[in-house]
Amino acid sequence: MKIFATSDVHGNRRIMDKLNTVAADVDLILVCGDIGGKDGRGKTFRQFSEYQKRDADYLSSVLKDIETESRFILGNDDWFEYEDSHYLQKVETIGGLKFIPFEYVLLTPFNTNREVNDNKLEYELGKFSAGSNTVMVAHTPPLGAGDILYNGSHCGSRYVRAWIEDVQPKLWLCGHIHEDNSATWIGDTLVLNCACNYPDGVLRGWIVDTDTMEYEAVEI
């Protein structure tokens, strides 16, 4: 199976429209959170939430028109509830692989949504039965993989990394840290930070073949 994974579109509809350009080359499209835009923070929370929900509606319509199998999760900058066939809310098996959504992120200085401490991350990950047939569709990166900030410091979760080292899923797909769109191996697990350059309207991500585990960067 060929997967295209991206993340952090942040309401940029130019980026969403570009998903059409990769759809024909893959079997599955995954968007790893932060769907809604960041504009409009001065509005009431309800208005802002509805604004973001319209971004999710637009993404869903794009995915529906593409017709390639697709799923997305929400991230820490998404402040809305959502119901949609493309929204991966529970474990699903697609093409013989188990896809597990994981929307939590490690605590940040910005008091965003879905933030938890390392102990909570460890607890939530402990609920899953995972292994070499598992693809984690996550938002947060593990420590030392796709987690480098603009100042060079690492901000990933040590418990997420420990879980990956122990369980060894096939893939950990994430975003969250826009500065570190990268690929890293942790043992037999390939960690791909798929975050877009949303301010400039640049679609970024990775195409990965789950049979051969070959992967290539995409930037459009």
Q: Which residues fall in each region the model found?
A:
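Conserved acidic residues
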Residues: 27-29, 132-134, 170
